[in-house]
C-alpha cells in the first residue's frame, strides 16, 4: 500500500471504523484503477496548479442563452466562444441533468443530460474551448429517481440509501433555512416511513452512513471526470 492508498484507508477508517475500512478502501481503489485504465491521460494529469488568480470562471445555467431550433448547450458554447473566448477560462455549468424541482437541484438521473438542454456531445463541444466544472448535487436526490422509487417499492439495494427516522424522534434542535419539515412521510411497501428531507419533500437526503452510497457517488464523480469535468 503506497502513501496515497494509506491516506485513503485512514480517511475511510475515520468515517466508517476500522473493521470495514479495508473492504471499503479496496472497493474505492478498484474503481480508481478502472478509471485509470479507461482514461490514462486524465489519470496521469497533475492536480497541482489547476486554478490560480489568473482564472476567470463563469457560472451559468445551461439554458441562459437560447436560439430557436438549437439545443441550449450548443447555443451557449457558440456564444461563449464568440464573445468570451479570450476572457473566460472555465465554465461552471449549474445542474444540467434531468430533474423534478428546484431549478435542477433535485436530480433524477446523475448520468444523463436533460434532453431539453442537449446531450453529452454538446457538453464535450463546450469543453473543447473551456475547462468545465459540473455542479454535482450529491447531498440529495429526486424523489422520482430510480433509487428512491426502488426504496419505496422495497428493493433491497436501496433500503439503506436514505435516512429513515423513527416516529417521535425529537428534531426540535435541527436548524436550517427552510420552512418545510426536516422529515417527510412516504408510503412504502413496508408501511409509512419518515424520510430525511433537508431541503424539500422532493429532495431526499442520501445516507452516507451506508458505504454503498459513497461508492456510487465516487462512480458518478469519476464519470463526470470522463465526460470533461475538470
Where are these regions (language model features)?
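Acidic/aromatic-lined carbohydrate-recognition and catalytic surfaces
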Residues: 3-218, 222, 226
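Structured mid-domain segments that build the active-site/substrate or prosthetic-cofactor binding neighborhood
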Residues: 230
